Amino acid sequence: MCIRDSSITEEAIEDNLYDRLASRYTKALARSMAQTKQIKAASILNNAFSTSNPVGDGAALCSSAHPSLSGNQRNLLTTAADLNETSLEQMLIDIASFTDERGLKVAVRGTKLIIPKELQFIAERVLNSNLRPGTADNDANAMKSMGMIPEGAVVNHFLTDTDAFFIKTDAPNGFKMFNRSPIKLSLIHI
């Protein structure tokens, strides 16, 4: 992570403006650090479909060909689709069909829908309307009544694809974030 350094002029120090300027610069650096962390974290999802950024098995994060001992496994829809009732239901069905490397079913389920800001209103209708969204049917909204996505939808403002959406599951070893080396701050007195 690279954060441009800031400096305070000798005149500012001589005129006793150091405290006020240092406080402003410190806040700007803190914002910059927080922004950089968010951008880096979102880059995993922003590049999820790119084979230029493979994960441990050599495939894109979202792929129809994750190699395993039991054959290729997929974690994306067979046919790409926009966020709607049908595509979300199919993703939840696919998640319930996940198997491990030996072909045994694993008990995972979707817990949270991760979306860009452009999909927040569609997600609200799909997840939280009492009746099926976008139809004249009076059927109950099955995803809502069954509690299929208990943590609801969360908007990630750093996602760059306006129609990509992701489901976080309750798999025990999902995404992890850690600071390999913490930010180092130093003050040089002249």
Predicted regions, residues:
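Conserved small/polar residues in nucleotide/adenosyl-binding loops
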Residues: 1-5, 188-190
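Short acidic, glycine/tyrosine-flanked loop/strand segments centered on an H-E-D-like triad
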Residues: 4-15
